[in-house]
A protein has these predicted regions:
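SAM/dcSAM-binding transferase cores
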Residues: 2-13, 17, 24-27, 31, ...
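The AdoMet/dcAdoMet-binding core of the Class I SAM-like
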Residues: 2-14, 87-194, 200, 215, ...
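Class I SAM-dependent methyltransferase Rossmann-like catalytic core
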Residues: 2-92, 102-115, 132-135
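A short SAM/SAH-binding and catalytic strip from SAM-dependent methyltransferases
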Residues: 197-211
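Conserved beta-strand signature within the Rossmann-like core of class I S-adenosyl-L-methionine
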Residues: 198-200, 227-235
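A short glycine-rich, Lys/Arg-flanked "PGG" loop and its adjoining helix->strand segment in the class I
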Residues: 211-227
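Conserved Class I S-adenosyl-L-methionine
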Residues: 241-264
Length: 360
């Protein structure tokens, strides 16, 4: 897969430079390189409400966002990913953590499960520098040291660091595999090879990283699920949910925490605790907001994916789909008392050939 024109959004460039300096100093034999990097990183850490830390993304289209909600990075991992994954009671668990970042989702998962559970954790992170940040971060999570050990071992084998400081072995029941690669390449390679109880999908927001929320990406994720497995993501964006529907998966509301409620998807409908509301279903099915991201060659840049969707929305709006601006689909077959809103909704309806809100 060619990705020469593809640059994934990552943490801010100044943080990446801290990591690169750390690599250089340690390769030169400086035993204090890691301490220097930890000190330099302090200037960029963002403390969240639960006491855990996150970082800002690089600037894209004039804006930046944090890697985690400011309401609590670790609590978000627990409430939006680990708990709704329904891993309780399983003796063997396999989890795919896409855009694993600092490793919070994975370490929270380890802490949550019993010590006698056999756990296989596949972490996917395109940015080696972002993955390295786990070595420079402090976390109160008991199992975070296992993530740090796995990252340290991987970087040592790759020749990026010269010293190993984590001496304790990872417990025999915990198996951590790192994939430092474009997630699109990884999921294609895993098909026919592995099936997962849970897939944590945790990229930056859909408009920043649409390549990991496309029709095609969810089709590949679908093929990686066990029969009762779930895909979990923090976003409730309409194009993301539309792509899930297009892939043939059942979906529902994920738990709310900080940001709006997330999304849960599964092969089986009875795995979904809370179906989407009728309003959400209508907006996805009938408005231009429900046009999903598409990546037919499975190697496009985020710019091309966004442009493709924008063009499709423009062509469909007022022709085969309602404009999403006044949320016309949610008012179908209802009475509207607000005169101004009613005029706007009726104008939208007439563009598609309907006379009023109760037209057949």
């Amino acid at each position: 897969m060619k990705t020469s024109d593809y640059k994934a959004l990552s943490v801010e460039e100044k943080v990446l430079e801290v990591v690169r300096n750390f690599f250089r100093e340690e390769k030169e034999g400086n035993h204090h390189a890691r301490d220097h990097a930890k000190l330099s990183l302090q200037d960029y850490l963002v403390k969240t409400d639960d006491g855990s830390y996150t970082l800002n993304s690089d600037i894209l289209d004039g804006k930046s966002e944090t890697m985690h909600t400011r309401h609590g990075a670790v609590r978000e991992a627990m409430e939006k990913f680990v708990k709704p994954a329904k891993l309780d009671g399983k003796d063997n668990v396999r989890v795919l953590d896409i855009c694993s970042g600092l490793g919070y989702n994975t370490s929270t998962c380890i802490d949550y499960l019993s010590d006698d559970v056999e756990i296989e954790l596949d972490l996917v992170e395109i940015s080696k520098e972002t993955l390295t940040l786990a070595l420079l971060m402090y976390s109160s999570l008991e199992s975070y040291r296992f993530i740090q050990k796995a990252v340290e071992d991987e970087l040592y084998e790759m020749g990026d660091i010269k010293f190993r400081y984590y001496q304790d072995d990872i417990p025999d029941n915990i198996h951590i595999n790192l994939y430092i690669e474009d997630a699109r390449v990884v999921v294609k390679g895993l098909e026919g090879y592995k099936k997962y109880d849970a897939i944590f999908l945790d990229p930056f927001s859909p408009l920043k990283s649409p390549e990991l929320y496309t029709n095609e990406f969810f089709m590949h994720l679908k093929n990686l699920l066990k029969d009762d497995g779930v895909i979990l993501t923090y976003t409730s964006a309409a194009p993301v949910r539309a792509a899930i529907v297009k892939s043939g998966l059942h979906l529902g509301e994920g738990p709310s925490f900080g940001r709006s409620g997330g999304t849960v998807a599964s092969l089986k409908e009875d795995v979904i605790d809370k179906p989407l509301s009728m309003d959400d279903e209508r907006m996805i099915a009938l408005s231009d907001a429900g046009i999903p991201f598409k990546d037919p060659e499975f190697n496009d840049s985020y710019q091309k994916i966004l442009q493709r969707r924008d063009q499709e929305r423009m062509l469909s709006r007022g022709r085969i789909r309602f404009s999403s601006t006044v949320k016309t689909p949610i008012y179908l077959n209802k009475e509207l008392d607000d005169g101004r809103l009613k005029r706007r909704v009726l104008n939208n309806l007439k563009k598609l050939g309907f006379d009023d809100l109760k037209s057949p």
